[in-house]
Amino acid sequence: VEDTEISDAHAIFELNFFGALNMIKEVVPVMRECGGGTIINISSVAAELAIPFQSFYSATKAALSSLSSALRGELAPFGIKVCAILPGDVKTDFTSSRRKNACDNSAYGDRVTRSVAVMEKDERNGLPPRAIARIAVKLASHKNPPVKVAGGRKYALFLFLNRILPARLVSYILAKMYA
């Protein structure tokens, strides 16, 4: 947090949250007129398992997941279903284009470097984007899709464990993995 400019925090919220919100605001009136449809938001496992040194990314995805849950109830009377896919690591150009915010003299320097290295390795070995697209297609044709769907079995297990394990233990594990 200390090494991130507020303008960078605004930018990631603008992209990950407000970008989706703007699209939703445009499609909802059309969907209402057409008698329904399905809105599928791409959130992240990080929405529920907040990743150290990815605090703003995690926060944007948590906001998007919460929006999806709330809209589901608001839009249901119009036949509009809302769900969120929570992928984990996906092989995309995001890995190579990630901005590293830690300053050379940062108190977090080595920890951020290690954390980013772990994330980049996981992303290079992640799911292909096509796997997430398949989940979206399946949700779009589902009569009553779930509110949230993990992006793959591995992440479904992580989300399940997050629900049953004590929060302190989950935080400890995430800190060991990423901090």
Where are these regions (language model features)?
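C-terminal helical subdomain
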Residues: 84, 106-155
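C-terminal beta-strand-loop-alpha-helix "lid" module of Rossmann-like NAD(P)-dependent dehydrogenases
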Residues: 72-123
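Hydrophobic positions on the long internal alpha-helix
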Residues: 23-27, 41, 67-68
